Structures are given as C-alpha cells and as structure tokens.
C-alpha cells in the first residue's frame, strides 16, 4: 500500500545534544526563564519537558528561596517520569530526589492522598508529585 502522506523532519540531532549542565536546547531555553512566576513549556512528546521542570524546580528550591515544589500532572502515568533522577552526573548542581512517600502517582502510594498532602505540607520534604 502506498504512503498517502509522508512527513519528514530535518533531523540534525541538535535537540539531543546537551550543554555543560546536561540540558538539551529546549531545556536550556526554559531554564533561562527560571525566575518567572509562571512558565508554560510547550514541546513535542519525549522532548524533555519533565526534566526541564526538574531543573527549574531544583533551582527555585536551592537558589530562589522557594521551600516546596508541588508537581501536578494530568495523569498518574506521567508522574512516573518524576522519579529520582541523577542530574549531577551530567553537570547539574543537584539531583532530583523526591521522597517516594510523596510521589502520589506511584502504585502503592499513600491510600489517603489528602492525608499524604497534609503530611507533606507539615514535613521538611520539599517535593510532592500528584495528579491535578
């Protein structure tokens, strides 16, 4: 059967190259706006949006005086992409290391999400992942 529609992209590999902090081009552009109160990142699937959020959230926690980060995702399966991630090995100043107890998107996580959320707010932990 012939292809009726064929789409090709100019694949240069540029989007997969990383800088000295381990960021792809799109992540670097997002990180440049890290001090913004609101930030919308629009990019294709699997382009590194979750990791871009990790970079920005860690900067807000370490350098901007923010005490807690709540990552609210539209569905539980997306929450899995926010598991612990070694970012230091690629040059970033910190690793993404949320406490498993406060990733409310993983199987077997806290039965009462409200209780877990309230516990997080009163704890010293700085990262919570949940659905919105």
Regions found by a protein language model. Give the residues of each.
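Walker A/P-loop
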Residues: 36-56
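Conserved Walker A/P-loop ATP-binding site and its immediately adjacent core
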Residues: 51-54, 61, 65-89, 131-132
């Amino acid at each position: 059967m012939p292809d009726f529609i064929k789409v090709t992209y100019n694949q240069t590999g540029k989007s997969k190259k990383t800088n000295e902090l381990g960021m792809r081009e799109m992540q670097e552009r997002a990180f440049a706006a890290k001090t913004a109160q609101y930030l919308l990142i629009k990019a294709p699937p699997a382009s590194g949006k979750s990791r871009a959020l990790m970079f920005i959230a860690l900067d807000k926690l370490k350098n901007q005086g923010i005490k807690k980060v709540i990552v609210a995702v539209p569905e539980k399966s997306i929450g899995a992409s926010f598991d612990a991630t070694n970012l230091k090995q690629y040059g970033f100043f910190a690793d993404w290391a949320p406490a498993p107890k406060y990733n409310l998107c993983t199987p077997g996580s806290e039965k009462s999400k409200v209780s877990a959320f309230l516990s997080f707010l009163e704890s010293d932990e700085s990262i919570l992942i949940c659905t919105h």
